[in-house]
A protein has these predicted regions:
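Serine-hydrolase catalytic machinery in alpha/beta-hydrolase-like enzymes
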Residues: 1-69, 78-86, 108
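Proline-centered helix-kink/hinge sites
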Residues: 20, 88, 114-116
Length: 157
């Protein structure tokens, strides 16, 4: 969370930033967000947890529920996409940094509205391959999914 610089930006522009952490995945001994793929052994309901976090923030701070954004790096990027799919009624936009979408996320994705998406990814990423693998869709397919869902052009204007 320290490397994002979001706290100083939030302080300057008056918004709330939170840094939730996924739970420990026993199979790997690492923290994770349950997004399918390599996390299929997880029984954690991370979408439900983050939905409750949003409820808590609204109860405590009366947040603008139309301006909830998710960003994450690597597995956090996967989780941001999962939220855009499974909690779309509450998520305005997402940014994934070196994340992708698992096959399970794509197959279960049914967003209720067009969702702004940004993807930051290196072509030579050796952890989350830009070109996909057994767990992840290739980034171009992920972008094509959102272009189709959002009924927009992939060309900037």
């Amino acid at each position: 969370m320290n490397y994002t610089g979001f706290q100083s930006i939030a302080d300057e522009f008056g918004f709330i930033v939170i840094y939730p952490q996924g739970t420990l995945l026993p199979a790997t001994g690492q923290t994770h967000w349950n997004v399918g793929g390599w996390t299929t052994s997880s029984i954690t309901d991370d979408v439900g947890f983050l939905n409750e976090v949003i409820d808590f923030l609204d109860d405590e701070y009366s947040i603008n529920l139309k301006q909830i954004y998710s960003t994450g790096m690597s597995n956090g990027g996967y989780m941001s996409y999962k939220l855009a799919c499974d909690l779309s009624s509450r998520i305005a936009a997402v940014v994934s940094v070196t994340g992708s979408m698992t096959v399970e996320t794509v197959e279960g994705c049914n967003p209720s509205h067009p969702t702004s998406i940004a993807q930051i990814h290196g072509l030579e990423d050796s952890v989350v391959s830009y070109y996909g693998n057994a767990f992840s869709k290739p980034i171009e397919e992920v972008m094509d999914y959102w272009v189709d869902h959002n009924n927009c052009s992939s060309e900037p204007n």
